[in-house]
Amino acid sequence: MLQRKSSSNVASDSERRSVFNETSFILLVLATIANGLASDFFVWSKDAGNFPLSPLVVFTLFVFVYLHQKNQNHTAALGIPIAVLALFMMIPSSLASWIGLLLASLLYRIQTDRFHQSLILLIMLALTFIWQNSIFKVVSGFILHAETWLIGAFLAPFYPEMTVYTNHLLFHNGHDLSINVGCSVFSNCSFVLLGWVSMYFLLGNRSLPIKWLAILFILLTLTNVVRIGVMAIDYPTYVFVHEGLGADIYNTILILLSVTPLLFSFCKKEKKACD
């Protein structure tokens, strides 16, 4: 009888420790993300930039916490990933925070020997900010030139007198467009893909559908081409699409694309009902 009680107490203590470790991991993840966004919030507070927190990032964090608590591991120790998060969250650097988040996620995978959906979201989130804030800025010259050429190829039938020069679209009426980082689909797509995968996992799916992600990227590319084509009409139209109501419509379209997994879920339910 005493042996059973002792075993039960040991199991209970082990479970409490694991819950504490998992909770600490989640809190440190959120603190590291806050540190990664701190500089952007500082710039925004000085009225020198846009609000730095995308609704899709907020949604991803919600899904991460929900899935992680649902699938948390009650056996493995998490000392190393927790220590990495605690270290990197104290470094006053946005890039360091995202690198720390990526390292901690990979170490979590190694220590627990599990690769569940919440961890995929965490890795995608870290890579999204590392890509946007660092890697894309380094390689943007080549990417923007190639993307401008592609946009020019699509728009050529509608603007026969248009000329493509590096990352510029030159029109005969003097209304020229420069395709910069903010206009690139490679900059805008990362958050949409993140939101799409978050919704996909929230609906109970487990594996990443590479085919659908590729289709989504193609849709984002075509949407961006149409947007730039409309901006090329004249300057007032450019202002409307780039800064006015047109910008809000475009952002709404991006959010709607990110929640398209709901359509898959609805179609599956309809199919089951018919069967």
Each PLM stretch: what is its role?
Residues 2-275:
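Hydrophobic N-terminal alpha-helices or hydrophobic patches in metabolic proteins across all domains
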